[in-house]
A protein has these predicted regions:
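Conserved beta-propeller blade signature
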Residues: 24-27, 69-72, 120-122
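C-terminal regions of proteins
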Residues: 103-117, 136-146
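Structural motif
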Residues: 32-40, 78-88, 128-155
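Flexible "stalk/tail and boundary" regions
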Residues: 21-22, 85-102, 114-117, 157
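A short beta-strand motif characteristic of beta-propeller blades
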Residues: 2-8, 46-53, 97-103
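Loop/turn-rich, solvent-exposed surfaces of beta-rich toroidal or solenoidal domains
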Residues: 53-94
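Eukaryotic tandem repeat interaction scaffolds
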Residues: 22-66
Length: 158
């Protein structure tokens, strides 16, 4: 990148993006099972597509830990549970996207996630005016959360 801001085209419509181990990971959210995640490498001033992976529907956040486990935040709707889906690695996720190693139920409207220092940090959109006040005319969130949820991965993998 030469300037403060650069623009790069990707092959899939981003619903969430993360950077891990020198790779840009871009997932596409669909309510049905046609979701994909594509990995990209930045090389010689260009973003080069590396590989495509199948992922479960409704993915809104991606994170990786030091063991290359994949954490996906999946959510759709203000009154449906969200889930943190955990896979051993990207190959396990690609092979069986509907069969995570572990699945943790969370409140509705989970969005982006981040992994740092043994914790998963989860953002929720349920306290935004659209969901909290129902400004879109589709009702209010049943469980508005205006905090970041922290999940200690030692409670998942003791």
């Amino acid at each position: 990148a030469t300037g403060m801001f650069e623009e790069y085209r990707v092959a899939n419509m981003p619903s969430c993006i993360t950077w891990h181990d020198g790779i840009l990971w871009v997932a596409t959210h669909h309510a049905l099972f046609k979701s994909i995640m594509i990995s990209y490498k930045y090389q010689d001033g260009e973003l080069m597509e590396q590989q495509r992976y199948q992922i479960p529907e409704k993915v809104q956040g991606i994170a990786f830990d030091e063991q290359d486990r994949v954490y996906l935040s999946t959510s759709y709707g203000r009154s449906n549970s969200s889930y943190l889906k955990i896979y051993q690695n990207v190959d396990a996720m690609d092979t069986k996207p509907r069969a995570p190693e572990l699945k943790v139920e969370m409140p509705p409207c989970s969005e982006e996630i981040n992994y740092a220092d043994g914790n998963i940090y989860v953002l929720f959109e349920s306290a935004s005016s659209k969901y909290f006040e129902g400004t879109d005319g589709k009702g209010k969130s049943i469980c508005p959360i205006d905090r970041i949820l922290t999940i200690d991965t030692n409670t998942i993998f003791p």
